[in-house]
Amino acid sequence: MIKHIGLILDGNRRWSKKHALKPWEGHEAGRLTLSILTRYWASKTDIKYLSLYALSLKNFLERSSLEKKLLYGSLERGFIDLLNDKLLKKEKIRIKIIGKWNLLPDKRLKKVLNEIISKTKKHNKKVLSFFICYDGQDEITEAAKEMKNVQRITRSTIKNNLFTKDLPPVDLLIRTGGEHRLSGFMLWDVSYAELYFTDILFPDFTPSSFNNAITEYKNRKRRFGK
């Protein structure tokens, strides 16, 4: 049984290039795809946790100011739509924002993020996590800093100091866009996850594509390193 799926949303910019569009038009197409996908997950599956790699810390630091500004606008529109979606309340979905998103310069976006966190904090049926300004090595580094005065450190101690302390291990990690790497996503929590890579660029990733990944997972035998 799948409890937790992680999804690396990759391929927006290549999709825009393929269709002779501007990079931010690819991000907007990805936003619309994500809306369809999350609604499908929320209403049509029994998977409790879905974690989305929306913006890496590396991309936040290195992308051009213009692209980031337009990306923030796309994120804001997406979260406003999510905030007003009745499905959040109906399915009791809690929204978590994970990473150093306090670094975001866009005050309106941060306001929306704080609002959606507050509005859904008591929901307990499903958990939808957005990783923004996140990097797995940075997460572990920050955990180490928190443990500087701890005398006996165990795996549980480390987990309890991670940004993802309230999330279970990832069962299935999906990456769209054709790349075969983790790019720093949830490094501690994907240690025994099944990995599924697809060449489909994220704006073209459909609920059917999502189900194909789940079917592939169910056909595998998990060994957990044994």
What are these regions (language model features)?
Residues 1-226:
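Flexible, compositionally biased loop and terminal segments
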